[in-house]
Amino acid sequence: MLNPDVKTIVDAVEGSQDLFRHSLPMIASENVTSPMVRKVLSSDLGHRYAEGQVGHRFYQGCGFVDVIEGKAIELAKEIFRAPHVNVQPVSGVNCNIAAFFALADPGDKLMALAVPSGGHISHAKFSAAGIRGLKIYTHPYDNQIMNIDVDRMIKQIREIRPRVVMFGASLFLFPHPVKEAREVCDEVGASIVYDGAHVLGLIAGGQFQDPLREGADVVTGSTHKTFPGPQGGIILCKEKFAKDIDEAVFPGTVSNAHLHHKAGLAITLAEMKAFGKQYAAQIVKNSQALGAAMDDLGFNVLCKDLGYTKSHQIAVDVSKIGGGSVLASKLERANIITNKNLFPWDDVNTTDNPSGLRLGTQELTRLGMNEPEMKEVAKFIKRVAIDKEEPEKVKKDVVHFKSQYQAVKYCFDGDGAYEFSLR
């Protein structure tokens, strides 16, 4: 018989497992790992430390860890064609903090997207950029194309002369103008950091854009969104920044790198080497198919004239049918898991119920769904959002539909997306 406190926790863990077994997971910042990755996450590595770099550790007993981290670095260099790789950060925000410490000093200027325009919180004064003491200026943004205004950006870089120009976003429909910024950044002495957290798997699979080839000096990213690995971070950079990046990671911002996650990352890198091109291509196809299907059903999907998206995300303005928070809550009752999202025209004080829904297809794709399934998903959302059906009624059909998608695809051992037991 379980201890009552332990039982409370075990019940909640199993409840969450069961929820997602029967739900449509459409949070754009999540994914599901392969069974092999889940196995190594529960290995003895989760008990161990390995401070330092491969071959230069401060503790004994790290020989196998060196093999694992060395293989992860080798695979990442190959997949991303990166001169230098650091796999030790424990999150995407950790990566950004390390990049800011490596490339800038307190009081230096940073250009990044505003949060309502899709910028991540770590690019703002109340998170990583503020921790480094950077003065933050926001990219000029074109609401019509949901992207940075290139001409105004170039002008602003010349005027402000920032130390770091940041690209990347949490609402990220289209590639950012890295190539267009490179020349003017060289002119003013600015480094380019590309936060690829959301699109790292797309980049690995040859989709979306190739920031290192387009002119980025440093690419940061989390490893658990379109890149379907365990939660963690990775930094890719040009060789000239390698020493500063490595020192900003250790001893700067990481002590122990969560070794079980690095083993999972290495396996996911092997999966992406084998299956990444097909996976990334299907994600983009599914996103565009979902956007078209929802548009056909009467939703206000942004950027129709641009094909809705080139990433794993679509953005839907639901301000006239309840707002993002209200609708996300209703969809959750139907086992459709989404999130509300600020849009550029929203007041920052409307975070409780902003205009938008952000929908991601990367996890549905990982579970084997293709374009025809996106039409079915769109119909489920319409029944709740537009037809005003009781969510609990729609839930029954969602559960039946999801029962057909219970295995992880684009990996070596795809059975059992939700196999799990604590009792």
Swiss-Prot record:
Q: Please name one Pfam family that this protein belongs to.
A: SHMT
EC top class, as a word: transferase
Q: Where is this site: Plays an important role in substrate specificity?
A: 224
Predominant cellular place of this UniProt entry's protein: cytoplasm
| Cofactor(s) in the UniProt record | pyridoxal 5'-phosphate
Entry EC number(s)? 2.1.2.1
Q: Which residues form a coiled coil?
A: none
**Molecular function GO terms recorded:** glycine hydroxymethyltransferase activity; pyridoxal phosphate binding
The protein's UniProt keywords, in alphabetical order, are:
Amino-acid biosynthesis, Cytoplasm, One-carbon metabolism, Pyridoxal phosphate, Transferase
Task: Detail which positions bind (6S)-5,6,7,8-tetrahydrofolate.
Answer: 119-121
In-chain residues carrying the UniProt-annotated modification N6-(pyridoxal phosphate)lysine: 225
Q: Where in the cell is it found?
A: Cytoplasm
User: Which InterPro entries does this entry report, sorted A to Z?
Assistant: PyrdxlP-dep_Trfase (IPR015424), PyrdxlP-dep_Trfase_major (IPR015421), PyrdxlP-dep_Trfase_small (IPR015422), Ser_HO-MeTrfase (IPR001085), Ser_HO-MeTrfase-like (IPR049943), Ser_HO-MeTrfase_PLP_BS (IPR019798), SHMT-like_dom (IPR039429)
Instruction: Copy the pathway line from the protein's UniProt record.
Output: One-carbon metabolism; tetrahydrofolate interconversion; Amino-acid biosynthesis; glycine biosynthesis; glycine from L-serine: step 1/1
Disulphide linkage map: none
Subunit and interaction comment: Homodimer.
Homology family: Belongs to the SHMT family.
> Which HAMAP family has this protein been placed in?
SHMT
* Name the record gives this protein: Serine hydroxymethyltransferase
